[in-house]
């Protein structure tokens, strides 16, 4: 089943900490390889809070909720940005239908 999460019932916008990079090579399965230029994407993860942990006990994406966090993620050195790698507090995230 699908599970949806929000910061609260008004469902304000939030962001995942992620990276993307261009890459040239062969991707796909051995049966259907695709050579050429690709965009690779990844999300930074952390230990789950108890809201997400009930559904996915291994990890959750790092969620950015403020302009300051977004600016840090996009522009700071890793020595500063790595401090964003933490779960939201349990009361900062809800499961919604």
Segments from the language model and where they lie:
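A structured binding-face within diverse protein domains that lines the active/interaction site
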Residues: 1-97
